[in-house]
């Protein structure tokens, strides 16, 4: 039966990895795999266990209890992501991200490279690397007319956005998972991973700035800055970003799960959105057509934002996290971790392999698996290194991260072009940051 379980999981995993080749959304194999695995466990009356992290051993449990336990842990992540996604969509409803374009005052390609890289690094730490990439590539399309130049910039945005997401508990779904699961605290994650992430960003940008693609000036007119469609755009941008940043502080003060703070932040942002939208503003360009408002129904910014949420991503996370939970409940991951430690005693090598692996396969199941494999306590450096490796390793292939996939779609970036031109920069940045992390850990933070 163990062989059947492993085959089903690997088949589902392969389908997720090959979603672009198979042309099916990865949520389909994730949900199917999850349901089939738990059905087999139930029908075959297989023994399920809960990992006792303190004693580092497996304790027998009942399927109803263990499934409810894992559903609760997964729901914490999903509700948190729903709140964050809605806040970002509310900012977009008021065209708040157009404010960022106003910061761009230079035509120098090299200065623009640094500007976009720093913006990607900071933005992704707040609104996550996927959303930051969408926002910056959209701005890129308005600022740079030459497509070949845009490809280079988009490639660098992928690297820097992923680096920016790795050090923040709200910057990447994998760091969010580790944070919500009480593997890392926000402060210690920042202390351990911020400097390696900066190295991971700066090294590739320094190397790329010597390329011909980033020499000279761009030809487009920077001065033709379009103001946000709403006068409340800048206010909603800063309010929304501030509300998301507030969540880690809320968790630290109250010791409540992060999704509670995110719901409070969403309520605050939504309140201001409703107040501002009552001033007859609508992002729709056809709002002046007589009778159009009534036809559209309730044009609430919250309703509109909720309708734009990336629900397939939420369902994918539900499927993959509960599928990995099935393997964890059977004790497979715990036993595999023991075998792995015997085969490769140096955990740093294991974690760096995780990082390289996250470029090939999705980093969400990788991190979910690592959480089931290792039982180290809160803020053990292992978890911080996993956060760094899984967050930044995906940059080595364009399909290795959500930021890469979305940039690939928006700019039609060729897989092999990225592999040839950008991948080595991502690898050098990843390796430099990893070395920096190990040196900091061994000689500065844990002397």
Give residue spans per PLM region.
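Alpha-helical transmembrane segments
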Residues: 72-81, 188-204, 254, 258-267, ...
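Transmembrane alpha-helical segments of multi-pass membrane transport proteins and ion-pumping complexes
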Residues: 38, 77, 81, 85, ...
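Transmembrane helical segments that form the transport core of multi-pass membrane transport proteins
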Residues: 94, 101-103, 112, 116, ...
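Hydrophobic alpha-helical transmembrane segments
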Residues: 6, 31-32, 78, 113-118, ...
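Interfacial loop-to-helix junctions that mark the boundaries of transmembrane helices
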Residues: 1, 21-27, 53-77, 186-195, ...
